[in-house]
Curated annotation (Swiss-Prot):
This is Type II NADH:quinone oxidoreductase. Binds 1 FAD per subunit. The active site is at E172. It comes from Staphylococcus epidermidis (strain ATCC 35984 / DSM 28319 / BCRC 17069 / CCUG 31568 / BM 3577 / RP62A). Keywords: Cell membrane, FAD, Flavoprotein, Membrane, NAD, Oxidoreductase.
């Protein structure tokens, strides 16, 4: 009977949550469960494309599409609401649009920027966090070029951009900037030699997930296109002028008209309020992706700190992992509904590609290093495949990179 259907509640329509729902609706009949998906926006956005929208190499509208395009309305109730409280013991979730009970819960609330308590970073630096922050940043950068061109008294700081962090997001953003800046210089009649791009990284090495050869390739590519790197240089503060860094024990002020922070993310702040043992918005999973003490609550994606059996550190937060977790969670939910035991999650690492603008990149694919146009092509394949898996061939054709 319909009233006996188990209530499956999925929070978040990012890669993990939406993958869970799209697989569930394929594998379950309409009367197998009452599935509800809650997301604070009516759209899903490709968070792995935010660096492009932030630089202005794509329009912000290019990276989003309506969640309704991906869900089967006969099987899934999609609710646009913001989650305000998760009561795991009462099996209830509160939102700004009402209260929802659950039998099985999937928490996939995504990430927010993490500034590690650096003084002034939240107030004075742009964050690459979501569609709105990316749109704001790209407009700001173009406005700086327009203002410079229109001003009688030129301020070269308008053409200076500081990027905090030489990890994945920072390097991909810099790559996009090296594509975008020649366009802006041409559009506004600006001498490109006056543009200054500086990347500041506290660690002794950038892109730590890659080999020294790949890192050297990426550094040379970006340096040849005007990027200056300050490695092993911690940022200790951010103000209206730019970053304050520490060099040989002394503080120095780096000045720029635009400061961007890319060096950290964390899970949703709601995690600390809802679960125990949470660090930086992430909770440690059991091997089947549920959490300790709750065999009917799955935590996946950026809110998950999954440590594979026999290892000591959690897997990183990537779209590839999030989507695999979503698929596995859907399979485990089906098992629970059928009265079967859940299965452990096994991550398959197919590789990682870091773009350097639209036509270059570096990466590891099934254990092999790749670089150049081959890497750039593969990145486009990966991006398009993600859309296909969530929204099907039609959406991939419309929104994909080909």
């Amino acid at each position: 009977m319909a009233q006996d259907r188990k209530k499956v509640l999925v929070l978040g329509a990012g890669y993990a949550g939406l993958q869970t729902v799209t697989k569930l609706q394929k594998e379950l009949s309409a009367d197998a469960a009452e599935i509800t998906l809650i997301n604070k926006n009516e759209y899903h956005y490709e968070s792995t494309w935010l660096h492009e929208a932030s630089a202005g190499t794509i329009n912000y509208e290019d990276l989003l599409y309506p969640v309704e395009k991906t869900v089967n309305k006969d099987k899934v109730n999609f609710v646009v609401a913001e989650v305000t409280k998760i009561d795991r013991n009462a099996k209830r979730v509160e939102t700004d649009k009402g209260v929802y009970d659950f039998d099985i819960l999937v928490v996939a609330l995504g990430f927010v920027s993490e500034t590690f308590g650096i003084d002034g970073m939240k107030e004075h630096a742009f964050q690459i966090e979501n569609v709105l922050t990316s749109r704001k940043l790209s407009r700001h950068i173009e406005d700086k070029f327009a203002n410079y061109a229109a001003s009688k008294e030129k301020d070269d700081k308008d053409l200076s951009i500081l990027v905090g962090g030489a990890g994945f997001t920072g390097i991909e953003f810099l790559g996009e900037l090296t594509d975008r800046i020649p366009e802006l210089c041409s559009k506004y009649g600006v001498d490109q030699s006056k543009v200054k791009l500086t990347c500041v990284e506290a660690a002794p090495k950038m892109l730590p997930m890659f080999s020294d050869d790949l890192v050297s390739y990426a550094v040379k590519y970006l340096e040849d296109r005007g990027v200056e790197f300050k490695i092993a240089t911690p940022i200790v503060a951010c103000n209206e002028k730019g970053f304050v860094v520490e060099v040989n024990g002394e503080k120095q002020q780096l000045e720029a008209g635009t400061s961007v922070w890319t060096a950290g993310v964390r899970g949703s702040h709601l995690m600390e309020e809802s679960f125990e043992g949470v660090k930086r918005g992430r909770v440690i999973n059991k091997q089947d992706l549920t959490i300790e003490g709750h065999n009917d609550i799955f935590v996946i994606g950026d809110c998950s700190a999954f440590i594979p059996a026999g290892e000591e550190r959690p897997l990183p937060t990537t779209a590839q992992i999030a989507m695999q977790q979503g698929e596995h969670t859907a399979s485990n939910i089906k098992r629970l509904l059928n009265g079967e035991s859940t299965q452990d999650f096994q991550y398959v690492n197919r590789g990682t590609v870091c773009s350097l603008g639209a036509n270059d990149g570096v990466g590891i694919v099934y254990g092999r290093d790749i670089a150049g146009k081959k890497a750039a092509f593969l990145k486009k394949v990966i991006d398009t495949r993600a859309i296909y898996k969530l929204g099907g061939i039609g959406l991939a054709f419309k929104k994909g990179k080909f």
